[in-house]
Design a protein with these regions (language model features):
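Short, structured coil segments at secondary-structure junctions
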Residues: 41, 61-63, 145
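N-terminal glycine-rich phosphate-binding loop and ensuing alpha1 helix
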Residues: 1-48
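Short phosphate-binding loop-to-helix
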Residues: 46, 52-100, 108-112, 116
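Hydrophobic helical membrane-anchoring modules
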Residues: 195-197, 202-225
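Short, high-confidence coil segments that cap the C-terminus of an alpha-helix
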Residues: 42, 93-96, 123-125, 224
Length: 225
């Protein structure tokens, strides 16, 4: 059984009410819910929230919010693993259920990429969305002071960029695992992790008002709205 759980707390600080703030004409979380529904792989879609308005919004979109997330899992220090472990346990999911944690702030999500997750779990404990760095991280600089910078990897200074290893980072959109892994693992990297690569054009952090404005420009440019 494939289950989707979308964490969506009400107390975002840098962008107030971020999860239901209108993004290109719709509540932010609606884009993620629509993508999950369009993937056509989930038997049930749940939202884990502490907020009555978010609950009302998601119920109107045809997903379930059968429990209230505890206060101690709704602050700035709660981890994804802790939130998911609570949701999986509260829902009483079977250990072998395949569970996707889908972030509410994923308006660029491609349903076909989301659907790759269950297959990846045949050979991994977790499968997560990733995207490549736009520039070689081996050329990263450390700021020692206002008057001094230095290479973090000076041994790479003469290496051609095309010879440097391509590196990836967490795309911050979705995470797949068996229900048992969500409950017993200490982090998403506790075990074997598979990556599901996404195009850089479909990935954007949305943590500040500036991020939000840029994301809306990208979204409209891609013709997604």
């Amino acid at each position: 059984m494939n289950i989707c759980i979308i964490p969506a707390r009400g107390g975002s600080k840098r962008i107030p009410r971020k999860n239901i703030k209108l993004f290109c004409g719709k509540p932010m979380i609606e884009w993620a819910i629509t993508a999950a529904q369009s993937a056509d792989i989930f038997e049930r879609i749940f939202v884990s929230t502490d907020d009555a308005e978010i609950k009302e919004t998601v119920l109107s979109l045809g997903v379930e919010a059968p429990f209230k997330r505890p206060e101690h899992l709704s602050d700035d220090f709660a981890t994804t693993i802790d939130v998911m472990a609570h949701a999986v346990s509260t829902l009483g999911l079977d250990n072998e259920s395949t569970v996707c944690c889908l972030y509410a702030t994923a308006p660029f999500l491609q349903p076909e990429k989301l659907a790759i997750g269950p297959e990846k779990l045949n050979h991994a404990d977790f499968a997560i969305s990733v995207t490549s760095y736009a520039f070689p991280i081996q050329r990263a600089l450390r700021v020692k002071s206002l008057d001094q910078i230095e290479m973090i990897n000076p041994e790479q200074i003469l290496t051609r960029s095309q010879d440097l290893e391509e590196c990836f980072h967490d795309a911050g959109q979705f995470y797949w695992a068996k229900a048992s892994s969500w409950v017993t693992r200490k982090s998403i990297f506790d075990g074997k992790v598979a990556g599901i690569p996404l195009p850089r054009s479909r990935v954007q952090d949305i943590d500040t008002p500036e991020d939000w404005e840029l994301a809306e420009v990208m979204f409209r440019t891609l013709g997604l709205g």
